[in-house]
């Protein structure tokens, strides 16, 4: 009897394991519209969840620990530090470079136990099976958190679980099994198929931790667009960078992003659409850019792009990614929506500014550009307006700078004519007002006018 319990006794549609308890294929886990197949998760042995510990003392080479006090004791695990788990998704693996890179960025800003969770044995199978196997992964993480609590008096509130794709729902399962006592869960583009629209029991939801934040980067419907991420909210704070569908720098041709099947089985990271992978790249970048991912409270991305959501509210803007937990209103509601834009390449951080330009000089047709100069850096030129330029009229725009300029010291104005004008008209900016996302306002003035393609420098009024 004991042996059969250890091996996993299948009784009807339920399977039980000594450490992890029982798993059934009853509703809502299976046999519902979103997951019609009656499938049980694989055994813990077959899923083979592994815990790869990186710390500030061993940033480059992991120590493998198990949920046993002796291996934890003999490792560099430090009970005086926070612990952040990182759980990969479908077809991925815990040794993939993005997980250890995320840990290494953390070590640049904090002392932390960073545990990469490898479950490649359970993720490299049919998607419908992998989506059940995350229940085992979540149970294993919860079991380890329980051992830390019982053997080392380590509080679950010091635990942060970061999950990508299917890993987001494994994180949710781990949190559910600790009755929401885990301090924080971050969902990085939680997987849509088999999870969107299911009961909260099955998927990541705000009750799974004291604080849940989610980054959505691939919310186009799976059919027909092959969008892998959930569009529904799943946290206290839900961030939709670039609107959540098309990430800058990702090609729109879906087929070009799907590698050949042999590549998939070699464990390549690019098994899926570029958009889906952007979520963990944004998070990794956010660790080293504490204020470069401000999210703006907004009803929709179209409102955000129409400049209706600037500046931040009186309590500020939450930062998407690593520092989302610094936001004062982080748990005042669930499904709070935030929008922002990011860059398109490796440096994803952006700083949003609003600029108002009051013109002087002649009435002409053309476009106006402004560049910002501050104590932290200088921006490139950004277009504020294009069309008929009228003196004494004020033109406004918002833009996302790839440079944080800090406190503004001066601005430069330039204008271009759209048509050849033999009268060589002159245009100036009598006043330029720059507002940062924190509501700080800087005013600059000039009485000069300039011909087209000539820079005009404005200093503080």
Swiss-Prot record:
GO cellular component: extracellular space
Catalytic activity: a triacylglycerol + H2O = a diacylglycerol + a fatty acid + H(+); 1,2,3-tributanoylglycerol + H2O = dibutanoylglycerol + butanoate + H(+); 1,2,3-tri-(9Z-octadecenoyl)-glycerol + H2O = di-(9Z)-octadecenoylglycerol + (9Z)-octadecenoate + H(+); all-trans-retinyl hexadecanoate + H2O = all-trans-retinol + hexadecanoate + H(+)
Top-rank lineage group of the source organism: Eukaryota
Gene Ontology biological process terms from the UniProt entry: cholesterol homeostasis; fatty acid biosynthetic process; high-density lipoprotein particle remodeling; triglyceride catabolic process
Active site: 165 (nucleophile), 189 (charge relay system), 276 (charge relay system)
Annotated S-S bridges: 16-22, 103-114, 250-274, 298-309, 312-317, 445-461
Molecular functions per Gene Ontology: all-trans-retinyl-palmitate hydrolase, all-trans-retinol forming activity; lipoprotein lipase activity; metal ion binding; phospholipase A1 activity; triacylglycerol lipase activity
PANTHER family documented for this protein: LIPASE (PTHR11610), PANCREATIC TRIACYLGLYCEROL LIPASE (PTHR11610:SF147)
Protein's name according to its UniProt entry: Pancreatic triacylglycerol lipase
UniProt source species: Equus caballus (Horse)
